[in-house]
From Swiss-Prot:
The gene is bmp2-a. This is Bone morphogenetic protein 2-A. Homodimer; disulfide-linked. PANTHER family: BONE MORPHOGENETIC PROTEIN 2, TGF-BETA FAMILY. Keywords: Chondrogenesis, Cleavage on pair of basic residues, Cytokine, Developmental protein, Differentiation, Disulfide bond, Glycoprotein, Growth factor, Osteogenesis, Secreted, Signal.
Length: 398
């Protein structure tokens, strides 16, 4: 980990110093590196540790995640990430995702996924229906995030057996919010219907149910979270139809089971009030091009951040790295048009030409863009989040 920190964080550290940024680097570290030019290994490691903590804080993390080796990334979250990349690469007016998914993501900059607690008890079932209770621990959702929508995803398997009638090919799945748990064994819980779906047996697929009202009640209104009741009604009571075609529990033969990939999943879409939503198009301004530009003048330089070099690839699922770029170069008098200067920078440079006590304008980022990251948080929950101001799109003298 120490070697990884030195390989990339030192590079980031010096480039941020060169670019004139003041937000990421601790002031103590700045003085040590700028005044002495060289520090002891202990001082260097302490500053780099502070820098890593600052970066983690920028990602909204209190500590470095250390996920276990058996953590499973839901395929749906990977699909969301790749669909988002396809959306960014698509031409204006085209979309790579369905309407429901795009509508949910258009109001959120964070997507979180939760697997249910498998220790929850099963509600006794009857010949006509299969009923089970699901509980999801949502304590990892920060208080400052506003949940804009939520969906419960349940996998159902294709039924191959012959049917006595067309009606026996259908099942109805009802999703209930448990408003009040059962007070006694003889009485069931108080529930409220959230969503319902009439499903056909002809294919294996995921079914998505809108559970936004329940999540909003639990989080926004600070009301108790007692979980959901999933009810599968077997229409026509055909004895040939397997009652377990909707996967709501683990198989008794886990060695032959793909349960981790198809277990029920709760997905929340939220916004922390920072930056743009995941699928809101951002128009980028065209960068100024100049045929003859001095190599020493202010311009954008390549900088690739490889998360494996820092040892963060165990909790950052995607991307493996990204092109951050940085700004560096001179802002000479007089400032040329291609240096994208402000009026204040022009005046400051003019004053510097006659009074060197006034510093020159600095070469800094003038336009930044966001990246999306899929990662595991401190609680091993999979998160897809849009991070603002991560990529330098343009530089100028300011």
């Amino acid at each position: 980990m120490v070697a990884g920190i030195h390989s990339l964080l030192l590079l980031l550290f010096y480039q941020v110093l060169l670019s004139g940024c003041t937000g990421l680097i601790p002031e103590e570290g700045k003085r040590k590196y700028t005044e002495s030019g060289r520090s002891s290994p202990q001082q260097s490691q302490r500053v780099l540790n502070q820098f890593e903590l600052r970066l983690l804080s920028m990602f909204g993390l209190k500590r470095r995640p250390t996920p276990g080796k058996n953590v499973v990334i839901p395929p749906y979250m990977l699909d969301l990430y790749h669909l988002h990349l396809a959306q960014l690469a698509a031409d204006e007016g085209t979309s790579a995702m369905d309407f429901q998914m795009e509508r949910a993501a258009s109001r959120a900059n964070t997507v979180r996924s939760f697997h249910h607690e498998e220790s929850m008890e099963e509600i006794p079932e009857s010949r006509e229906k299969t009923i089970q209770r699901f509980f999801f621990n949502l304590s990892s959702i920060p208080n400052e995030e506003l949940v804009t929508s939520a969906e419960l995803r349940i996998f159902r398997e294709q039924v191959q057996e012959p049917f006595e009638s067309d009606s026996s090919k259908l099942h109805r799945i009802n999703i209930y919010d448990i408003v009040k748990p059962a007070a006694a064994a003889s009485r069931g819980p108080v529930v409220r219907l959230l969503d319902t779906r009439l499903v056909h047996h002809n294919e294996s697929k995921w079914e998505s149910f809108d559970v936004t009202p329940a999540i909003a009640r639990w989080i926004a209104h600070k009301q108790p979270n007692h979980g959901f009741v999933v009810e599968v009604n077997h229409l026509d009571n055909d004895k040939n139809v397997p009652k377990k075609h909707v996967r709501i529990s683990r198989s008794l033969t886990p060695d032959k089971d793909n349960w981790p990939q198809i277990r029920p999943l709760l997905v929340t879409f939220s916004h922390d009030g920072k930056g743009h939503a995941l699928h809101k198009r951002q128009k980028r301004q065209a960068r100024h091009k100049q045929r003859k530009r001095l190599k020493s003048s202010c311009r954008r330089h390549p900088l690739y951040v490889d998360f494996s070099d820092v040892g963060w690839n165990d909790w950052i699922v995607a991307p493996p790295g990204y092109h951050a770029f940085y700004c560096h170069g001179e802002c000479p008098f007089p400032l040329a048009d291609h240096l994208n200067s402000t009026n204040h920078a022009i005046v400051q440079t003019l004053v510097n030409s006659v009074n060197t006590n006034i510093p020159k304008a600095c070469c800094v980022p003038t336009e930044l863009s966001a990246i999306s990251m899929l990662y595991l948080d401190e609680n091993e929950k999979v998160v897809l989040k849009n991070y603002q101001d991560m990529v330098v799109e343009g530089c100028g003298c300011r």
